[in-house]
Amino acid sequence: MMNSKQTLFSLLMCVLALTSCDTQKQATVGNELALTRAKQTLDSLYLNYSVSGTCLLRENYPSNIGEYTATYLASEEQKNMPNLYSYLWPYSGTFSAVNALFATTGDKEYKSVLDNKVLVGLEEYFDTRRTPEAYASYINSAPQSDRFYDDNVWLGIDFTDTYMLTKEPKYLQKAQLIWNFIESGTDDNLGGGIYWCEQRKESKNTCSNAPGSVFALKLFEATKDSAYFVKGQRLYEWTQTNLQDSTDYLYFDNINLNGKVDKAKFAYNSGQMMQSASLLYQFTGQEKYLTDAQNIAKGCHNYFFQDYTPENGKPFKLLKKGDVWFIAVMLRGFIELYQADKNGTYLDSFSKSLDYAWGHARDEKGLFNTDFSGKTQDNRRWLLTQAAMVEM
């Protein structure tokens, strides 16, 4: 007789056998305009952010290197250091962007861009001086920089997606190497969970744990190793227990080691929990996960969109001004949920917002502001914003 773990594994294998590996590919029929816009935006990105003689990119346009301070780092010293090149996080957005174009079109041109441009530049951040090996927040030729678990999780997801598209083992090997680093950032404090930064283990953040769950579940799909499923499920449950707002089903930002919760709400955190719940529903068929995902989706639609009426136009739901890459990651959750319930309401809101942004938030160089209404302009255009627009 099979034990419970064997039974679960057998059921999961049946689900995977019935689930096409092509679910991450979006149908191109009817999306020609969106695809053309994505290609144009990628061209604008490389035209305006490339650094001659390298595969690296600037962080902003215009660059104004001495005037820019990255606000998303842990180290004050590193924050105030002028950098010629983008930090890892904004650079990594190009991986997701090119992956999305490759997945959508199947065009080997994007596989070439990935292998010969994106991943060549990415390896400039790969740190082999510390163990486990992982990607650092800045290039290796500079002084040693912090390593973030969330930065690496996003890359692990991308490498796994590329493996699922190509079945080339080198991508899966890199994803599994990254997973080893992620696991090194877990312990029993607060009952589990992944820290945010390797050098400053002071908090466990939704931005590490929610995508950590997605990453593990994708690795399960790629390898059929049920250990990844168990880890992904546990990360989902830990994050839900410790960081969900029970009033609207959205997710808070982090919990420190004293148990104090930072109650800021960002689109990507809730979006990744929506995606994880949708994957868990896909793999188990348990309705509670579908309900979880649908509750988060409703909360996100209410919180991150606004009622907007353009001049001489019909009212619609427009994405609020904010971090555009956070919005792109939230969209991943809505896409995954759509695979389960076929409710197109939320994707329609995204489509209308992106269409409006094309006409109102895009400048003469083909770069986007963060205010999709077009009422305010950014002083500089962030690399990660442009990559996010390509992905969406």
Which ranges hold each PLM region?
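Well-ordered alpha-helical scaffold segments within catalytic/enzyme domains
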Residues: 92-108, 154-168, 211-225, 272-286, ...
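Bacterial lipoprotein signal-peptidase II cleavage site
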Residues: 22-27
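CBM-like carbohydrate-recognition segments
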Residues: 29-97, 101-150, 204, 295, ...
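C-terminal motif of bacterial Sec signal peptides marking the signal peptidase cleavage site
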Residues: 17-20
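Bacterial N-terminal signal peptides that target proteins for export
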Residues: 1-9
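Active-site cradle of extracellular carbohydrate-active enzymes
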Residues: 207-212, 216-219, 228-280
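Oxyanion-binding "anion nests"
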Residues: 269-284, 289-305
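Extended ligand-binding groove/face enriched in aromatic
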Residues: 111-219, 226-230
